[in-house]
Each structure stands twice: as structure tokens, then as C-alpha cells.
Amino acid sequence: MDCDICHRSHDAKRLPFLCTVDARAALYDGRIENVMALIENEDLQKQISDLLDETNAPTKDRKDALQAQQRTAEDRTTQILAAADKLRNDIKAAKEEIQTRRAALSRRKSDIAAVSDGLIERRVKRQKSVERETGMHKYRWTKCADELARTRSFLCIEAAQLYGLKRIKEGSPSKYEYYLGGIPVVDLTAMNSSTPEMISTSLSHICQILILVSHYLSIRLPAAITLPHRDYPRPTIFNLSASYRPGDPVFPSQASVSSPSSTTDTESQRVSRPRPLFIDKPLSQLAKEDPATFSYFIEGVTLLAYNIAWACNTQGVSIGDKALFEDMSNMGRNLYNLLINHQSAGKDPDTLKNEADGQTSRFGQYSHGTTFYHLGGAEGTEFSKTFKLPSPMKLADKLKKKLLSEAPTPDWEVLDDDAWKVEEELADGSQVNKNLLMGDKSSPRRGTSGWMRVKNR
């Protein structure tokens, strides 16, 4: 309430008494409390007076009600006392548990303090011990890998010598001829001048030694090679997409005799058909008479050269310029460098860079058969990215164009006996007319018989 004299609201703590209104306002709460106490006192006096004024004895119902109230009060008091006792016991147990935990925590702190003394030194010592053991294991693994690489190198050299792989210098100082099994290694760019028997035999020898070497080196060639076996006595090779697929492959002889009912998926069989590594006819004649077989054969020999180049790169053997078709298709030189001359073969700049970084890629290290230097691991994958070979299909197209452009054009065309029937009939008819005009009674002469004629240019 506002003061009528000073016109301000009353605040008992912050504002002092300046007038009677402020004093009255300060006493207002106390007066209210006094009035309430007086009213309560009057009520109690009235109750006492009523009890004293009762002259009659209490009735039975009144006694029963009072006894019931007494029993209720006693029961409630008992419950309250039991709850109080239970609460005291809980408090006592909690205090004991707190004391036990404090004692355990104190012991743990003392133990931690005792253990923490010299913890850093022990940790450093343990770390050095683990690093030393790890280094020893790595050294042993590296030593075993080096011994395995030397063993692989020895096996490859021995296999090459047993197969008769050698290099013979030709007329020019930089030209070499490579022999395997006593016959020259086929030159892909000069197959037009080679006989079918020599080409097939040379490719068969290359397949056999390449499979043996891949077994020694524990590497999986990109294009799967199938050696002669019971179902098919000729070597074949699969393209990159169809290699190492589950299921039985369809060889050319099996595809020719298979019935349409047994062929469930023609497209899958076409994809999984192996490429032949043999020919029965001269290459120029095969290209003219059977272009499909010619294309399959060119693709097969290109895949074989691709396998050799890929094996050289995985073993750190240089093949020259990977972009040049001549370096990729030179199977004799690449095979000789891989098996015999791999220790002294020239290294490409990527290999020299790896050696400068301390990561040498020596012969026989990387393979698919060991976890150390595994070609499928992270380190092997990074190593595989250092060399990038051109696609075998592009190489096959280049080889096909080169062979077709260099195919010899014959000056003589071989004809069978049926081709001369028309000319003989024409010659006989002209001779009969001539005899009739001349009146010659002798038997007519037949035309000159032969088996070839000059081809018109």
C-alpha cells in the first residue's frame, strides 16, 4: 500500500519508517497473525467448554469409535516405528557399503600409484621389444622370400635349359634367333613364311614351358592355357574374360559334334570357346578359306604373347617399350629374358625408381601362391599398377592387318579337273568344225590337258 504522506510503496527491508503510515504497514502482518492465533484459541476454549459441560457418560458407540481410533493410531504408530527401524538399518548398511567402497577405492588408488611408478619406461621397453620381434619376423620372412625367389630362379633356368631354350646370333650383331626344343621360336610377324607344322610345334613348346614356369613362379596367367589332354589333343588358350570360369569349356571338336538339344546357352559357349594355338594349313590359305578360324588363331597367339609379356613385368624383367607391337609380340626374346637372362636383362625406368626407393622387384618375388609379396595384396596391386600393357584385342588387330598386308599373292592359280571341262568342250567343238571344213577323216585331237594356268592380272 502507498503512503499517504510520502507517496511511495512500503518495503520493510529497504525503506525505513518515515511516517505513521509506514509504521502501520510494518505492523500489519504481525496483527494478522495475532488475530489468527486469537481465533484458534477461542475455538479450543469452546471445545474444552463443551467437553466439560457434558454430564452424561459416553455411549457404547462412542467408546467403540474411540477404541477403533485408538487401535488405528496404535497400528499406524507401529508401522511408522517399523519403517523408521528399516530406514535406520538401510542407512547403516549404506554407510557400511560406502566405507567398504572407500577402502577398496583407496586400495586401488594405492595400487595404481604403485604400478604407475616407471610405467612410461616399461611401456617404451615393451614397445621396443615388440618392434624388435616384428623386425626379426620380417627379416626371417624376407630371408625366406629371397631363398624362395632364388629357388624359383634356379628351377626356371633349369627348365629352360632342359627344354633347349637358347639364343643364336644371326648375321647382324643385334639380331638373334631363339630356339626352343630344337626348332625356332615362331615370330608372329613372319608367320606367313613359316610352315603350319613348325608354327604348331613351336607354339606347343611355348605353352608347355610357360605352364611349367607359371607353376614354379606360382603366378596365374591372365589368359588361361589348356595343354593337350584326353578330350582335345591340341593346345588352346582362353581370352581374358573367359579365363578361369567354372564349367566345362567347349572345344572346337566338341562344338562341331554337339547337338542343338545339348546346347543350352549358345552365347555363353561362344564366349568360353578357347582360341586354337595350332594350324593345319598355311596362314594365307587359312585366312582365305576359313576367316573365323584365322581370327581365332591370331587372337590366340596374341594372348600367348600377352601372357609372356605380363609374366615378364610381374617378375621385374623389361620387355622394352610396352606401346610397341614389336616388343610385345617378340615371344622368343621375352621368354629368353624371363627364364635365362632375367638377372642381366635391362630394367625400365619404373623398376629403377622402385630400386632407388628401396623396393626392388627381383625375379621370383611376387606371386599368387604366397602371402609375402602377394600379387593380390595391397603391395602387389600397387606394383601391378606400375606397368600397363595394351589390350590383347588391339594387338590382335595390328597383327592381323600386318599379316594380311604381307600375305604373298600367287602368280599361279591351282585348278581342279572340273575347271578344265568347259575349255576342253570348247576346244573339241572348234576342232570338229575345222575337220568338217577341211574334210579330214582322222579323229579329232583333244585340247591340251593340264592342271594349272596363268592367272589373269
Curated annotation (Swiss-Prot):
GO biological process, one term: SNARE complex assembly
GO MF term (any one): SNARE binding
Topology in membrane: Peripheral membrane protein
Low complexity biased stretches: 253-266
Disruption phenotype: Significantly decreases the radial growth of colonies under nutrient-rich conditions. Strongly reduces conidiation. Causes only mild infection in point-inoculated spikelets of flowering wheat heads and impairs the spreading to nearby spikelets.
Family designation: Belongs to the ATG14 family.
Protein name: Autophagy-related protein 14
Biological classification of the source: Eukaryota, Fungi, Dikarya, Ascomycota, Pezizomycotina
Protein's gene: ATG14
